[in-house]
Amino acid sequence: YDGQHPNLFSPKEEVPHDEFTSIEDINNYLLQHPEVINFIKSNAVNGDMGKALFLMFDEKTEQLAKAIGLDVCFPSAQLRMFLDNKVNTNRIAEKAGVACVPNVLSPVTDYKHLKQVSEKLGESLVVQTPFGDSGHTTFFISNEEEFNTYAEEIIKEKEVKIMKRINCYGTAIEGCVTQHGTLVAPL
């Protein structure tokens, strides 16, 4: 919008920075950028710098936001990271009675071990590491050759989610806990 949109702000000058490797890096860069800090301060109301929402954030983001007086409107980065772990969310879902694709949570040392721990799930498996974005750490494995392609990424994890491969329709479900209850909606 070339600075013309009333609800959008982007700094005009680029400040030297390390290469961005994550959304968190971008947020942290912006929270340290002098133009962004000046913009936030110039829009303060009675000394209140306001509140911030971030798609992704980490402990550094929280520290930077706090340093300029912003209140992050999410649970802590530590809790977000815990809940972003697919192994943890699987355990929470099962505890809450949410039906899950048949699965087992286990470390994997090699293909033979994978087959042993997933024997009840059949020949065609889906293996997910605890963290990943947009399917980059979801692996479809039905033989040793396919396993070997991803072995290093799978074996290095303390625990992975191993699921029976099913034919399903793709969808996303988002949940939000508020003071009024929990909202769950497909997107």
Task: Give a label for each model feature.
Residues 102-103, 125-150, 170-172:
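Glycine-rich phosphate-binding loop of ATP-grasp-fold ATP-dependent ligases
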Residues 141-187:
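Phosphate-binding site of ATP-dependent enzymes
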Residues 92-103:
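A polyampholytic, Gly/Pro-enriched intrinsically disordered region
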Residues 117-126:
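Acidic/histidine-enriched active-site and ligand-binding environments that engage anionic O-linkages
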Residues 1-82, 111-112:
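ATP-binding N-terminal substructure of ATP-dependent carboxylate-amine bond-forming enzymes
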Residues 71, 99, 124:
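Residue-level detector of anion-binding/catalytic polar loops
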Residues 13-20, 102-110, 139-142:
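Short acidic-hydrophobic, aromatic-tinged amphipathic segments that line or gate anion-handling sites
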Residues 65, 89-94:
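Structural element of the ATP-grasp superfamily
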